[in-house]
């Protein structure tokens, strides 16, 4: 077979694959590309920024036309886990903590005070039960992430230190960890905090007021990229410990973990399998 024919066949094959990716699901090819370059993204930064720039064009939670690909593979829910009448089940595995409940209409947010003491809870409302995993991170201002392993493997919460204060952020509320309990941060610190965009990235936006009454803002966020690639269910947990990361500056991202067909893999080793119990 001549080199010309071989080259033509290769071009046709590659074109067909590219077309199939695009037609099957907008954003899937981008998602696969993000997965393949993830480890290099926070070193070089530029390729990841280029892939995402035309896809993520949202500000303050308002998605612009043509950015539905973001919603297809970046999902964020609430930091919440439901409890049945018998209370929560706590399952420890090789490096992860699962909180599970089969049924409940009223729920608690079940949180560690991060001092090794007993767990405690604060009341929340949720619509459905979750299997929740907490994984500690070894760097920066983001210390722990929570992942919904029940079905979608979404990143659903983050524990971080912001302005010297340990906090758990989820949706519209901020809880301050004061090492003796968990309280809603309503008056201890003069600040405003919220998440945006709620359907794409988990963004903790905090606005701080100084002694002169001037407000400044800081953003930290975590994200979840989830997609199918060549029949493999891949999920990539990303987190940034830098402020204002939504600007897509370089060297912001770290790979938190990879979900490969139900196996949650962290850099260098297999930590645990997804817990699917009730």
Curated annotation (Swiss-Prot):
Keywords: Cell membrane, Glycoprotein, GPI-anchor, Lipoprotein, Membrane, Signal
Residue numbers covered by the propeptide annotation in the UniProt entry: 97-278
Signal peptide, first to last residue: 1-20
Lipid moiety-binding region (GPI-anchor amidated glycine): 96
GO cellular component, one term: endoplasmic reticulum
Subcellular localization, as worded in the UniProt entry: Cell membrane
UniProt membrane topology term: Lipid-anchor; GPI-anchor
Highest taxon of source: Eukaryota
Protein name: Uncharacterized GPI-anchored protein C212.08c
Protein's organism: Schizosaccharomyces pombe (strain 972 / ATCC 24843)
Native organism taxonomy: Eukaryota, Fungi, Dikarya, Ascomycota, Taphrinomycotina
